[in-house]
Amino acid sequence: MTNGRKMEYKLVDSEKDIERSYEPRRKPKRSRIQLHDWQSMLLEHSFRMNPYPDRIEKYNLFLKTKIPMKNVKIWFQNRRAREKSFYEEAVEVHRDGRRAGHRSLGSRSALFAEEFQYRRY
């Protein structure tokens, strides 16, 4: 006993226990936010109006959707990345006529290519 406290010791029995005691602790798996349909639709509509919202627009989306601002910001980043990959794939399909190993996207790719000619990236 030290300072009125009882000291407890754990005996390590095996080599596995010794190795485990030196392993770094893993972080618990991060939970994901599940968006409702109305939240997704509102974010999509906002994205169509402006893919690069400023802080005030993000704050307004936070107030409307109750999605944390950090998640709104990340949603827009991910959405722009997805849009860019659609565009790049559409340009490739349009240029080559088909994509090796993938089925053609057809008219959808042409629509993306036309739409993105006028967007800034």
From Swiss-Prot:
Residues 28-87 bind DNA. It holds the Pfam family Homeodomain. GO terms for cellular component: nucleus. InterPro entries: HD (IPR001356), Homeodomain-like_sf (IPR009057). PROSITE patterns: HOMEOBOX_2. The keyword Calcium does not apply. Keywords: DNA-binding, Homeobox, Nucleus. GO terms for molecular function: DNA binding. It is found in: Nucleus. This is Homeobox protein HD-6. The lineage of its organism: Eukaryota, Fungi, Fungi incertae sedis, Microsporidia, Unikaryonidae.
